[in-house]
């Protein structure tokens, strides 16, 4: 059963030369995560973070210098909450600082990746969106009761993530989670979702 935090994103028609639905690439110490948040994309992201982390630590030791940060550029409409949390935890475990950059749009489960960065940047014309989780579910009445309990646990976790890594007051957080409203860079800076507008 897939749990999505928000609506499942519809895929745009493929263009000539487009061989993958996920777009994750590495250039020097930069990772470009231009993808939905799903198991495959987050697995690939986690591997790329681990690879760059190992290279950065080795480089730092060989040159006896400070470890350079990994720069993670995010353009994502979100997706699967569990996959998003897995990548969030990978970022938090990294021995190398990871600077996150909102590059156009970070929504839903992708915001978990954004808000836990060591330093968080957002381009001035970008947007973020947070909202409550949603699920696709089928089962018996007892299954629904269990699902409600599971969803309550996940919502509590989502709120705790924002409480720990942003400055959004709980009353405001409860209000915005009920809606699908974009926040511009200035609003994200005001509520501590990012540290700097670039």
Spans of features found by a protein language model:
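Terminal-region recognition feature
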Residues: 1-198
């Amino acid at each position: 059963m897939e749990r999505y935090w928000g609506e499942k994103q519809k895929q745009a028609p493929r263009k000539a030369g487009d061989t993958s639905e996920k777009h994750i690439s590495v250039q020097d110490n930069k990772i470009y995560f231009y993808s939905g948040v799903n198991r495959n994309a987050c697995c690939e992201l986690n591997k790329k973070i681990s690879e760059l982390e190992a290279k950065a630590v080795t480089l730092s030791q060989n040159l006896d210098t400070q470890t350079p940060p990994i720069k993670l550029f995010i353009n994502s409409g979100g997706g699967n909450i569990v996959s998003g949390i897995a990548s969030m935890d990978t970022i938090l475990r990294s021995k190398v600082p990871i600077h996150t950059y909102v590059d156009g749009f970070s929504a839903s489960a992708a915001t978990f990746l954004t808000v836990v960065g060591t330093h968080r940047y957002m381009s001035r014309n970008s947007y973020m969106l947070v909202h409550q989780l949603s699920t696709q579910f089928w089962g018996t009445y007892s299954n629904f009761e269990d699902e409600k309990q599971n969803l309550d646990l996940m919502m509590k976790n989502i709120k705790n993530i924002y409480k720990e890594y942003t400055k959004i007051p709980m009353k405001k957080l409860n209000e915005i989670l009920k809606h699908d409203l974009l926040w511009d860079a200035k609003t994200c800076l005001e509520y501590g979702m990012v540290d700097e507008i670039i």
